[in-house]
């Protein structure tokens, strides 16, 4: 999918870019796989903001995505490649030979009419899903499970990929895009290939209104707030932070403080941390 550059007809259009959606084959989603999605605007059940900078934006329907890929041995045909407003990756509508329809994350190179299949005996081909233990070393994968049968949780964003490095007992070593090397149970499934729509990260939003269409509200610096709104607020003019270290709006240390639990059970499954040289 290419990048479309706009002419600077207005200040908002200057430097604005978008995807050309050349890979998208239909603009009408499969109605049976849509669910209504209520706009929470970052509020919880008490009406309090729990996630800042969310609200407004265009109405959306949620597309039910098959992250489990557990219909073993049943072949499916790719019918369409579609846009999904709820994620950066595109999605593909597949029709199984037993009549079931499903959406999957569209990997790079997947085309309409292509046949895909899941299961331990599936070929190492883009779009096929297999247990990690059945995937050869060096293969690029995405949509990786962390618990067998739970569905893919890792490597689902546009352009993301991971690589199978080897096997240690019942675990398989996988290198994630961050550089982290992690041990994952060999019975967990992954899909062969890289997630498509990799040029999505190159898009220049161009103007504030386009962020609002996406439901993203402005982020205001703490230093321009009042003291009752933020620890950095107050003072005359461009005042410094006035504390030993920068703080979050709730007074906790920000910028550089490690937040990972040192006693996390998954620590023993990390072979190499993402920030190790």
Curated annotation (Swiss-Prot):
A GO molecular function held by the record: structural constituent of ribosome
Chain residue ranges for the region called Disordered: 219-277
PROSITE patterns, per the entry: RIBOSOMAL_L2
GO cellular component: large ribosomal subunit
Highest taxon above the source species: Bacteria
Stretches with biased composition (Basic residues): 259-277
Matching InterPro entries: NA-bd_OB-fold (IPR012340), Rib_uL2_dom2 (IPR014722), Ribosomal_uL2 (IPR002171), Ribosomal_uL2_bac/org-type (IPR005880), Ribosomal_uL2_C (IPR022669), Ribosomal_uL2_CS (IPR022671), Ribosomal_uL2_dom3 (IPR014726), Ribosomal_uL2_RNA-bd_dom (IPR022666)
UniProt feature coiled coil, ranges: none
Gene3D superfamilies in the record: 2.30.30.30, Nucleic acid-binding proteins, Ribosomal protein L2, domain 3
SMART domains xref list: Ribosomal_L2, Ribosomal_L2_C
GO annotation terms (biological process): cytoplasmic translation
Keyword entries, A-Z: Ribonucleoprotein, Ribosomal protein, RNA-binding, rRNA-binding
SUPFAM superfamilies named among the record's database cross-references: Nucleic acid-binding proteins (SSF50249), Translation proteins SH3-like domain (SSF50104)
Self-association and partners: Part of the 50S ribosomal subunit. Forms a bridge to the 30S subunit in the 70S ribosome.
General function of this protein: One of the primary rRNA binding proteins. Required for association of the 30S and 50S subunits to form the 70S ribosome, for tRNA binding and peptide bond formation. It has been suggested to have peptidyltransferase activity; this is somewhat controversial. Makes several contacts with the 16S rRNA in the 70S ribosome.
NCBIfam families documented for this protein: rplB_bact
Family stated for the protein in its record: Belongs to the universal ribosomal protein uL2 family.
Descriptive protein name: Large ribosomal subunit protein uL2
Annotated source species: Streptococcus equi subsp. equi (strain 4047)
